């Protein structure tokens, strides 16, 4: 078990000590989508959803989700984030809400989980705001697109 940094001597989960790691500039980008039907798409597009402006509320929820990541994922460190940006757009061809989150910080650990949380919470918010109209929406393709900084180097996902 000693090769795994997330386990203590008894084999139980622990939060990794990052105190000795150097501070570096870090960025993570995550993305995902919510597939909807034509009626739901039209209501989102026109601003006609009874709960309000779906894209704006989901954007705010995504920012809040990134900030709350260590509260819902046990081994995530609380991180002082420098920036959280969510872009939500409508894809007419797919009939989807496209979600992209970028999170930045100067820190000892990365912000991948914060970016993924932002996308996930934004997607769940889209679902919540539209569920009265459509129950069979699909939240899909949540993924890490890229990350920079840290001792493990940069990562860029091959995207189509």
Feature names for model-found ranges:
Residues 1-55, 60-77, 83-160:
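C-terminal binding/interaction regions
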């Amino acid at each position: 078990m000693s090769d795994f940094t997330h386990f203590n001597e008894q084999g139980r989960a622990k939060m990794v000590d990052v105190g000795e790691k150097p501070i570096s500039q870090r960025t993570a980008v995550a993305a995902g989508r919510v597939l909807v039907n034509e009626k739901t798409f039209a209501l989102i597009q026109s601003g006609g959803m009874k709960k309000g402006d779906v894209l704006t509320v989901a954007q705010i929820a995504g920012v809040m989700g990134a900030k709350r990541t260590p509260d819902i994922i046990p081994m995530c460190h609380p991180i002082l984030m420098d920036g959280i940006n969510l872009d939500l757009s409508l894809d007419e061809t797919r009939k989807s809400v496209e979600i992209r989150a970028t999170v930045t910080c100067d820190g000892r650990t990365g912000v991948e989980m914060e970016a993924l949380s932002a996308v996930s919470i934004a997607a769940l918010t889209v679902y919540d705001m539209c569920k009265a109209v459509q129950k069979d929406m699909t939240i899909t393709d949540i993924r890490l697109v890229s990350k920079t900084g840290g001792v493990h180097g940069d990562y860029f996902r091959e995207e189509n």
